[in-house]
Amino acid sequence: RSCEICHNVGNDCDYDYVQECDSPEDQCGTVMLEGSLAPFSVRTIHRNCFSSSLCKLEHFDVNTGNGAYLRGRIHCCDQQKCEGRPFPGLPLSYPNGYVCPGVLRGLFSDSSESEAACKGDETKCITIVGYRKERFLGDIAYNIKGCVSSCPELILSNRTHEERRNELIKVECRDAAKTTPSE
């Protein structure tokens, strides 16, 4: 299988090329990412070869606290070029009494860990640590912690670190802590 490859800031690619996929990356896909550290946000698009297990994730939304979040939409297909799915508006939700550690390191310079107040149906804490190897940018390390509504099934890879690959080092998901109201 061959897939279109591109990485760009915004919602579309200014450039692209086609690359043969290596096993186990057997599907073409597009990942749309949106990261926010209030009041700033940035969207990026990534077209690449993906494993079908990553394609099953479809979307994720991580509340990292203090108005910061990371969300992604994953769309895989059988064509070389998969169109990205648009982001829905952010839901209006209120704190629900659960808390998690929160950090968004690697995407923004302010990456100190804090407490994330979970909102709406967020009752789980997630930690994702890894890096992305990029041909032009070098390695992009990331450490993401925050509240989520459910735990994704992400599998760590034992493959060698190949060019332009996303390498997960740590994925943990657990129940969030319930805060006790102060009197």
From Swiss-Prot:
Disulfide bonds join C3-C28, C6-C13, C21-C49, C55-C76, C77-C82, C100-C125, C118-C147, C151-C173. InterPro entries: CNF-like_PLA2_Inhibitor, LY6_UPA_recep-like, PLipase_A2-inh_b-type, PLipase_A2_inh_N, Snake_toxin-like_sf. Its main location: secreted. One of its GO terms (cellular component) is extracellular region. Expressed by the liver. GO terms for molecular function: phospholipase A2 activity; phospholipase A2 inhibitor activity. It is found in: Secreted. It comes from the Eukaryota. SMART domains: LU (SM00134). Keywords: Disulfide bond, Glycoprotein, Hydrolase, Phospholipase A2 inhibitor, Secreted. Belongs to the CNF-like-inhibitor family. Phospholipase A2 (PA2) inhibitor. Inhibits the enzymatic activity of PA2 of Deinagkistrodon acutus. Also shows a wide anti-hemorrhage activities to D.acutus, Naja atra and Agkistrodon halys venom. The native protein is more potent than the recombinant one. This is Phospholipase A2 inhibitor gamma subunit A1. It comes from Trimerodytes annularis.
